Amino acid sequence: MLGPVLRLVVKAGKERKLRNFYPNLYRDEIAAPPEGVGVAEAVDAEGHFLAVGYYDPRSRVPFRAFRFDPGPLNRAFFQGRFARALRRRQGLGESHRLVHGEADGLPGLVVDRFGEVLVLQVRSRGMEALREVWLPALLEVVAPKGVYERSDVEARRQEGLPERVGVVYGEVPEVLEVEEDGLRFPIPLALAQKTGYYLDQRENRRLFEAMVRPGERVLDVYSYVGGFALRAARKGAYALAVDKDLEALGVLDQAALRLGLRVDIRHGEALPTLRGLEGPFHHVLLDPPTLVKRPEELPAMKRHLVDLVREALRLLAEEGFLWLSSCSYHLRLEDLLEVARRAAADLGRRLRVHRVTYQPEDHPWSLHIPESLYLKTLVLQDDPL
């Protein structure tokens, strides 16, 4: 049944977190930690029920709540969670995020869907321990042809868990064909970044393609497999993609060849490559990897971002658009605005905020879990007077 076998007492005052549906409890928030590891019931100082979750003192987050009503963490529970996630993604096409961790009530689990293949990541000890319960439930609800695991992320290493990479169910091609709005990307799953494709930028890519005009010049920095660059080329614009990942640039090259499109490619680190380029470009896109994983890293990373944005603005055409994204929770929208102001001041450029976007609906943002909002994009336009 996997009903609660442990009882965890929460410190007075800290029970408000669970009552407000925040799922994580840290060591200093637990008054009476249970002996052992396993499914646990969290109660307040007076013994009133708060949540059911998984307790493991070796985890950086010892208790993660799975449900806020009494009950087991059995196959039926996980079937219900997966069925709800599937229902909420109806109409989003064949490529989307099916499970987005805590925001879908499944802490430590990410599942991306690419047609009939699922690619998953297990990021927490609790979800790893419950694998034999939730994996059959996932297969029953979604009925994929194959499931591939890419549990080789930093969050897993922080949990002290070994990496797991490979096929866990059915048949999965070595090279997965990922489709998005008529573009197809041949992704080698064993070599790809994360789960293979950055689905969270889908709506930004659509917005970008709608804004690009034939004959414009586009610079796609941190391009990965060229989701933006290929859309620019499809609209008749000149596109230059920059990335340090040779495998990703190879995928971009193959995708462009198949479509009969031209995208120029530069292999290298972003900042030195930008310094060696000449403009102008009508669109410059900066989508760096997670730059800030801990709050203490924020000042140094903001300085680095100012350098990047300054070079991007140097290359930006008059009335051109700068797209600045951050997938770091600790780098807030206010930080991005500050970075842009500092870089613009250095060059004497006047900018206006054309648009601010966030992650799409298949990467849900829970009001009660601030960390579930991670992707922010500033679309800035050069605004001379």
Curated annotation (Swiss-Prot):
GO molecular function terms attached to this record: methyltransferase activity; RNA binding
Chief location of this protein within or outside the cell: cytoplasm
UniProt key word Cytoplasm: yes
Phenotype on disruption: Lack of methylation of cytosine at position 1942 (m5C1942) of 23S rRNA.
Annotated ranges, domain PUA: 5-79
Positions annotated to bind S-adenosyl-L-methionine: Q193, Y198, R205, Y222, D243, A270, D287
Subcellular location: Cytoplasm
Annotated Gene Ontology cellular component terms: cytoplasm
A GO biological process held by the record: methylation
Top-level EC class as recorded in UniProt: transferase
InterPro entries named among the record's database cross-references: PUA-like_sf (IPR015947), PUA_sf (IPR036974), RlmI-like_PUA (IPR041532), SAM-dep_methyl-trfase (IPR019614), SAM-dependent_MTases_sf (IPR029063)
Signal peptide: none
EC number: 2.1.1.-
Matching Pfam families: Methyltrans_SAM, PUA_3
Keywords: Cytoplasm, Methyltransferase, S-adenosyl-L-methionine, Transferase
Residues annotated as the enzyme's active site: C327
Binding partners and assembly: Monomer (in vitro).
Function description: Specifically methylates the cytosine at position 1942 (m5C1942) of 23S rRNA.
Family named by the database record: Belongs to the methyltransferase superfamily. RlmI family.
Name of the protein: Ribosomal RNA large subunit methyltransferase I
UniProt lineage: Bacteria, Thermotogati, Deinococcota, Deinococci, Thermales
